Design a protein with these regions (language model features):
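Extended beta-strand-rich architecture
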Residues: 2-6, 25-27, 33-36, 41-44, ...
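Generic N-terminal amphipathic, Lys/Arg-enriched alpha-helix
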Residues: 4-15
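N-terminal structured subdomain of primase-like DNA metabolism proteins
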Residues: 15-21
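Function-determining surface determinants
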Residues: 47-49
Length: 511
């Protein structure tokens, strides 16, 4: 989980803009209820470990915004105010197979601080926030990467195009021109992320109206766009493969700057498919929560006023409580509302990447109410836990493989066609269970095999020393039915059939 440290002075300055007095003791005592863990607090600041699902808490500005609502009952709207801008960015159609999702925004008149120390601290905080988003939402820049630029150094409109690896420009922290290939071979960021462009003859660059490269996503910015102590107007670009991750990343950077007084302006993007997009979209997302689901999970009826107050603490809004007029006559799923059933219409911020399902709204309401306030009733029926029939076999398999020096891992059951079949050069031998409305391109199906997940893990760690030996015993879904499978994979310099046979024989002997 990402760990961040925020200075007391930074938090105090941000809260004072809204007439709130900062209380470090209150933060240390209650902030953990919101979705993070206070690791340490000293005279200089507070160190916080943020849960993986709360990517909206990774900057001091967004954390202060969340704390305003949660700790101080200061209502924060679930929308981000975005004014209509005039700057455009044209995206070449060739980017569809290189890096198809391209978004941008302008933020002007940001208050970066009153002293050089405050402005330097702001720049460092902005860069840290950017890298934390790369790590979490961006999956190490694979799904989304962010570029932040000094707008005063740019000449709009902008163009995104594909260039060959001989194309030259001066990258960040360098004083001379380098070719794309030289950057990938020798620049620190180039060598770290070159694998994201592996096998591509052409790579993406963003240029301004006079042909200067301001960004080479997902690797490095141009040197002339560097953010300095004098920068108050910003241009943000976000590129990647996952539209939802890119949108959330863009909104969170804009939100951080808006919390410092910045005015967010939209950009007109002529996308890879020829459609015109106006981004960012600061409007809240609307969700439907069946009252039946809320009552069943929380154990009783929750009044609308309590729901409204709880959602406001979490940065959301209860729009209305009404009777459902459409949907199935009778629903077999808790999350679906039937005709005639009472539902709650809820707005949550579009940058809340973790709100995927109505059950997430139940969690938001429970957190806003406070788990200590939900009651302490116990079940009148006492039951004893009994191991499942397969539990002993699974334990023996894991123990056998672990005793052979193979590390046990646990990967996600959700996967996609590329990992499960295309990269493995396999064809599906069973019916594939697909997600009806996938939130991300990474998770579109339920896995049929475990081995592709292990291969993906080894591929991600190919830069680390060998040997690497991993195994997993877990569930797969074939022909829409769950089943248990075991797989192991070893990356070794001298690996061969004899080693694989030895592992199989040892496992058979132990069973």
């Amino acid at each position: 989980m990402p760990t961040v440290k925020y200075g007391h002075d930074s938090i105090r300055n941000l809260l004072s803009n809204f007439g709130i007095d900062y209380d470090p003791i209150l933060w240390e005592a209650q902030l953990s209820d919101i979705g993070c863990v206070v690791e340490e607090a000293d005279d200089e600041g507070i160190e916080i470990e943020v849960f993986p699902d709360r990517s909206d808490l990774l900057s001091v500005e967004t954390m202060a915004r969340a704390a305003r609502a949660f700790l101080y009952s200061d209502i924060t709207p679930p929308q981000l105010k975005v004014e209509t801008g005039t700057i455009e960015m044209d995206v070449d159609a060739s980017l569809s197979s290189i890096r198809p999702v391209i978004l941008g925004a302008i933020v002007r008149n940001v208050n970066t601080g009153n002293t050089d120390d405050e402005r330097n601290e702001f720049i460092q905080s902005l860069m840290d926030h950017q890298e934390k988003l790369h790590l979490t939402l961006g999956r190490k820049r694979r799904l989304a990467s962010i570029g932040v630029h000094d707008l005063s150094t740019l000449a709009p409109p902008f163009k995104v195009k594909a260039v060959d690896r001989k194309h030259r420009f001066t990258p960040l922290a360098m004083e001379t021109d380098m070719s794309i290939q030289e950057i990938l071979d020798s620049h620190p960021k180039g060598t770290e992320y070159a694998h994201l462009l592996e096998g591509m003859e052409f790579v993406p660059v963003i240029e301004d109206a006079v042909g200067r490269v301001l960004s080479f996503p997902p690797i490095i910015n141009g040197s002339h766009t560097t953010v300095t102590e004098e920068t108050t107007d910003f241009m943000i670009d976000v590129t990647g493969w996952d539209e939802r991750a890119c949108e959330a990343s863009l909104l969170l950077v804009c939100l951080s700057l808006a919390e410092r007084g910045g005015k967010v302006e939209s950009m007109k993007i002529n996308s890879v498919n020829g459609n015109d997009l106006i981004v960012p979209n600061g409007q809240a997302r609307t969700h439907i929560l069946p009252e039946r689901l809320l009552e069943r999970i929380l154990g009783g009826k929750i009044e609308s006023d309590v729901i409204r107050s709880a959602l406001e603490r979490m940065g959301g809004r209860l729009v209305e409580t009404r009777t459902a007029t459409d949907g199935p006559r009778k629903s077999n799923r808790w999350a679906d509302a039937s005709v005639g059933e009472k539902i709650h219409v809820i707005e949550m911020p579009r940058w809340r990447f973790d709100i995927l399902h109505p059950i997430d709204l139940v969690e938001e309401i429970a957190t806003g109410i406070g788990y200590e306030s939900l009651g302490e009733s116990f079940s009148s029926l006492a039951l004893e836990g009994v191991p499942l029939s397969r539990a002993t076999l699974i334990r023996r398999i894991n123990e056998s493989l672990s005793s052979q020096g193979i590390q046990q891992v646990q990967s996600l059951t959700l996967s996609n066609d590329e990992i499960q079949f295309e990269r493995m050069r396999w064809k599906p031998l069973h019916q594939v269970t697909r997600i009806a409305n996938p939130i991300t391109i990474e998770h579109t199906i339920l896995r049929q095999n475990i081995l592709p997940s292990l291969m993906e893990l080894l591929a991600a760690n190919r830069h680390h020393e060998l040997p690497q030996r991993v195994q997993e015993c877990g569930e797969v879904v074939r022909d829409h039915h769950n089943a248990w499978r075991v797989a192991w994979a070893c990356a070794e310099t001298n690996a061969g059939f004899t080693a694989a046979k030895g592992i199989a024989q040892a496992l058979a002997r132990d069973l």
